[in-house]
Amino acid sequence: MPQTQTAPTELGSESIGILLKKYAVPGIIAMTASSLYNMVDSIYIGHIPGSGSLAISGLAVTFPLMNLSTALGTLVGVGAATMISVLLGQRNYKIANKVLANEVTLNCIVGLLFTVFCLMFLDPILYFFGASANTLKYARDYMEIILYGNVITHLYFGLNSIIRSSGNPKMAMGLTLFTVILNSILDPIFIFTFGMGVRGAALATVICQAVSLAYSIYYFTRKDNVLRLPKGFFSLEWRIAKDSLSIGMGPFLMNSASCIVTMFINQQLLKYGGDLAIGACGIINRINFLFIMVVMGFNQGMQPIAGYNFGARKYSRVREVFLRTSMWATIITGFWFIASEFFPEVMVSIFTNDPSLKEMAEKGLRVMNPVVLVVGWQMVSTNLFQSLGMVRKSIFLSLSRQLLYLVPLLYLMPLFFDIHGVFAAFPISDALACVTTLVMIGNLMRKFSRLKDGDEPTILGSAIS
């Protein structure tokens, strides 16, 4: 007879160092695998004979639309995962199950609406995001397949996040690794053997996510789980949905801002450097994404620990997990800095053999990343506000770097430095965002120092207290 799953009470009692290792390592592996998952498509597409450079530029044009899809997924999924972590800390299993059911229903609705809208206006959207007559075909071929599988993608990432937040990070990691490995196998088969090109890469992606989603649904229908989908789980409780969407608003706006900013970036790159510049920036984004995902893996490990202990009123543990996560994130961004500034040619050569594209990507990588050393800490700080349900602060930090600082610089810097000014806008905005974060996180830590474990968190202003 299977043993009934219990809430992960170790989150409130075990050593923070041990917990962070247990929860962050699977998250790091899963998020690194996720970044490799995206990189695999770019690597194979960049080496398509005769059209690799234009194809990878076309793929880069789809990034804003992919970011917007991700934004809608995080609007639902992150809020639900955060609520479930806190509810498990409070041992409120009934409401946690309702949150899970709401997450599935909302993801289906949002994913379907997004798919229908984008398919109706796909060509104008892609032109708006920076496509040219040369790259539109590749961007359209890729996005059509991705959009047909959009509901699958939303559900896959949403349920994977909840599996991790409910105390099973190894399973979440395993599903991600399985998806990456399967995608690495299917990509060359569909792209080269079947001659499907970029459409083959997209189809492989959707198939892999569908297989992992099927197992995730099975996992949440098992009777031995404290967190499970009830029969007839396609239902919506607006109070729960409102709270979940409120908490997820921060990462939603961050990803939406990323979509808008990427559109501005592509338009400026096309203006000052043409399709080649968009392809170069696409390669740089894939390289940066690898290191960002490692930091996000630490964030994923921190989130259930911070959320549970906040729900249990153990504020000293919340502060400790934040400080430890910040330290490790800074170490990771140190490696990111070294790779960008001293070994750019090694990183870029993975994606393309085109000499002109390689030269522009290598120069751009050096210009974009001199301030990344402090970016990891800034990401962890933003994640802490999100994990504690501090919606307004999370939203502001999510938007400050991209909209408040980066967008104006994208239009100002090229006036003086041409295409290099577009790349130089990134480190300047990173530095300004980190100063803003320092002020806000310092204020939060001072408030934590005034709270004793067990006190009501009124002074913190959390939406889920």
Where are these regions (language model features)?
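Hydrophobic/aromatic residues in alpha-helical transmembrane segments
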Residues: 25, 41, 80, 121-122, ...
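Transmembrane helix-bundle signature of multi-pass secondary active exporters and lipid flippases
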Residues: 28-82, 146-153, 242-309, 329-337, ...
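Helix-loop interface residues and adjacent transmembrane-helix termini in multi-pass membrane transporters
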Residues: 36-39, 47, 53, 87-90, ...
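Membrane-helix interface/capping residues of multi-pass secondary transporters
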Residues: 42, 53-56, 93, 122, ...
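Small-residue-rich hydrophobic transmembrane alpha-helices
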Residues: 56-116, 153-172, 280-344, 375-389, ...
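Hydrophobic transmembrane alpha-helices of multi-pass small-molecule transporters
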Residues: 68, 183-188, 213-217, 289-293, ...
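Short runs within selected transmembrane alpha-helices of multi-pass transporters and secretion channels
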Residues: 146-164, 175-183, 201-214, 296-300, ...
